[in-house]
Amino acid sequence: MVTMEELREMDCSVLKRLMNRDENGGGAGGSGSHGTLGLPSGGKCLLLDCRPFLAHSAGYILGSVNVRCNTIVRRRAKGSVSLEQILPAEEEVRARLRSGLYSAVIVYDERSPRAESLREDSTVSLVVQALRRNAERTDICLLKGGYERFSSEYPEFCSKTKALAAIPPPVPPSATEPLDLGCSSCGTPLHDQGGPVEILPFLYLGSAYHAARRDMLDALGITALLNVSSDCPNHFEGHYQYKCIPVEDNHKADISSWFMEAIEYIDAVKDCRGRVLVHCQAGISRSATICLAYLMMKKRVRLEEAFEFVKQRRSIISPNFSFMGQLLQFESQVLATSCAAEAASPSGPLRERGKTPATPTSQFVFSFPVSVGVHSAPSSLPYLHSPITTSPSC
């Protein structure tokens, strides 16, 4: 057990005062500041969210950094995780921790009331162990009551996913009417109803219709568009930045060869504090595939998590069979790359004698036709019915 002597506790009211002071003082407390809060002593505090990616995405304490501790990480950890495993995309945070630049780290889960109630194999416990090995001079505190209590008492210091406007289902046609799967009772195709959906604060997903609506784009603060098609026009080239990925929505298309270029483009827009709309014709297959690849690469999550995350925001996404297969292969490469980085890290797990870390293929390019059945099951993700399975070396 993680005992009281090993882990200090912090009341929600104390964290609220820190955040309020930091906000009034103009300090770094936003989500773009790597979870850093200013302390009265002049030091800096790091806020770590130890909940799963989907829970963090649904709502989180402002400025917190989400740690990665999914099933794959737990299986490999064997009771001990590295900073590279739990913070794979936060190089600056890892460097600051190792340099002792944080005076304190506050960790929180969903609702743990006290440190003594934590299990040894809980995410918080594993994270605390990693912090104690790599940031020995840093105070570590558990937020009492976790996100559940803090968000209940101080919702103004939390960010929650906006409720999505429900898209009315198509009205079943009568026996005398022709079947039109693409339209609802209002005559507007289902994929064009509503507006683009927010995947991340700087990343939106939509259709060609949305890309042609300048009023929608301006209302969302869109500054760039990623056109994942060979035939959709770029309507406002003098007003927005454009990039085209000429991929057809068929089983022969190699969309994975564009993954890294698309990811770099999205990051470039993000770095300029812009917002990008990724679209194809319907915003269902090609553009959804790019958004899934981005989440997998940058958030270091598996396809299962990324798919569920995007589907919660745009329920009609359905990458074609080949694209799903290429995403599964991309998942293997992302995981293999993470493992190689961990093995090369000074604090990473020791390599077993005679074994070498997995080496990913270059450029994350996979060009092959595959068939992956996509079905809608209420209690499982579509691609889980696929005959394709991946067994990452790590």
UniProtKB/Swiss-Prot annotation:
Location in the cell: Nucleus
Disulfide bridges in this chain: none
Q: Does the keyword Transcription regulation apply?
A: no
Enumerate the UniProt keywords alphabetically: Acetylation, Hydrolase, Nucleus, Phosphoprotein, Protein phosphatase
**One cellular component term from this protein's GO annotations in UniProt:** cytoplasm
GO terms for biological process, alphabetical: dephosphorylation; endoderm formation; negative regulation of ERK1 and ERK2 cascade; negative regulation of MAPK cascade; signal transduction
* SMART domains listed in its UniProt record: DSPc (SM00195), PTPc_motif (SM00404), RHOD (SM00450)
Q: Which CDD domains does the record cross-reference, listed alphabetically?
A: DSP_DUSP4, DSP_MapKP
**EC annotation?**
3.1.3.16, 3.1.3.48
Tyrosine-protein phosphatase domain span: 195-336
Signal sequence, renumbered to the chain: none
One Pfam family per UniProt? Rhodanese
Any one Gene Ontology molecular-function term assigned to this protein's record = protein tyrosine phosphatase activity
Q: Where is the Rhodanese domain?
A: 41-159
Top-rank taxon, per record: Eukaryota
Q: Top-level EC class, please?
A: hydrolase
UniProt catalytic activity? O-phospho-L-tyrosyl-[protein] + H2O = L-tyrosyl-[protein] + phosphate; O-phospho-L-seryl-[protein] + H2O = L-seryl-[protein] + phosphate; O-phospho-L-threonyl-[protein] + H2O = L-threonyl-[protein] + phosphate
Q: Which family does it belong to?
A: Belongs to the protein-tyrosine phosphatase family. Non-receptor class dual specificity subfamily.
On assembly, the entry states: Hollow spherical complex composed of 24 subunits with pseudooctahedral symmetry, has a tetramer as the basic unit.
Protein name from the UniProt record: Dual specificity protein phosphatase 4
Gene source species: Homo sapiens
Upper taxonomic lineage: Eukaryota, Metazoa, Chordata, Craniata, Vertebrata
Q: What's the name of its gene? A: DUSP4
